[in-house]
Amino acid sequence: MMARRDPTSWAKRLVRAQTLQKQRRAPVGPRAPPPDEEDPRLKCKNCGAFGHTARSTRCPMKCWKAALVPATLGKKEGKENLKPWKPGVEANPGPLNKDKGEKEERPRQQDPQRKALLHMFSGKPPEKPLPNGKGSTESSDYLRVARGPMPVHTTCKRPRMDPVLSGRSATEMSGRGSVLASLSPLRKASLSSSSSLGPKERQTGAAADIPRPAVRHQVHETLLVVEPTHSSPEGSCREVPQAASKTHGLLQAVRTQAQDKRPAVTSQPCPSAATHSLGLGSNLSFGSGAKRPAQAPIQACLNFPKKPRLGPFQIPESTIQGGELGAPENLQPPPAATELGPSRSPQMGRRTPAQVPSVERQPPHRRPCLPTAQACTMSHHPAASHDGAQPLRVLFRRLENGRWSSSLLAAPSFHSPEKPGAFLAQSPHVSEKSEAPCVRVPPSVLYEDLQVSSSSEDSDSDLE
């Protein structure tokens, strides 16, 4: 009988019995884990609580049914005062209440001292206290309410200025602003130094011998009027106009009489300090005060002639021997400029009839602007053909749009290019068939000249 029993079946029966017994012991609802099963050293990664791990069934993130609601420990009635009430006044105050009463009486005793100080600063006589205690209440009211000196309202107004003077001052201020804005830093420095002087010093230094009309109850001051010349903005000294003062209540006849008696005085050139700082001066016109000051054109005291700037291929006028008006000139550029191209042609020999007036030498003067359609002839290169023919001449014309057009012309022969002063002694009256010896130039130079002139003509035709 014992040999027939299978050990495996017996083991299976034992496991079933144990599981059934555990199921019977398990409670129906969720139960709280015992405190001995919690380990504070463990921390759950899902919920972040201590005492269990992420694998534990006690984690509320895994099993929401097993999550426990935290129970309240009890109500705290003293936390919130839902029924506030005021404590009643006790008939027999204790020691604490007595201390409070003493603290309140001390500031009342200090009231007379404060009152005396306030009377000293305010200057009011002290008030006598009344027997019924009204003085104490008034003193406390005086301390509580901030009182100060009443503002004094005056009816006096500012004197109104004469409309003529106000208009003139406005125009003078605007003129002064425009003059200061247009001045250079050196002019501003000199102007500030001149304006720092007193009005009496300026009057005596600028024009000390200017007669003034003797009019009763009227004061005139010199008024500096400066107008910049049209030639250059830096050619004249600028002075800040002085404001002229007039008295009120003058008749129109007195004003007209003062204007009739006003002398026209022309002042001397600018002071030496201003001339040294600026380099140029101006004539100033002085006049007595009126509605509009008399203005006169002012010319520069020192107008130095400007030296004409010469281009890289231009010739000074002192080296030219002369020629007829409007005669074409044959110029020869230096050998270093043979590789520049057609862009240098407008600067090589720009000469007008006004620049060559006669055969005799004359001092240099300012060159006028070149007209838009005035021709200027010159030789392009000192190159001649290989068979000893005439050299080339190029005629340059200035178009309306500011560009230049060139054309080839026959020209007389030139001297050797080794002598740069040969073109100075040549006369512009040489005929086309000159008897001067010709210079033989290789054909490559001639071909280069023709190529340059043709390219310039093509560019001009494309632009047109």
UniProtKB/Swiss-Prot annotation:
Residues 74-83, 97-114 have a biased composition (Basic and acidic residues). InterPro entries: FAM90 (IPR039213), Znf-CCHC_6 (IPR041670). It holds the Pfam family zf-CCHC_6. Residues 180-197 have a biased composition (Low complexity). Residues 16-42, 71-213, 228-247, 254-273, 309-389, 418-437 are annotated as: Disordered. PANTHER family: FAMILY WITH SEQUENCE SIMILARITY 90 MEMBER A11, PSEUDOGENE-RELATED, PROTEIN FAM90A1. Belongs to the FAM90 family. Primate-specific FAM90A gene family, thought to have arisen during multiple duplication and rearrangement events. This is Protein FAM90A20. The lineage of its organism: Eukaryota, Metazoa, Chordata, Craniata, Vertebrata. The gene is FAM90A20.
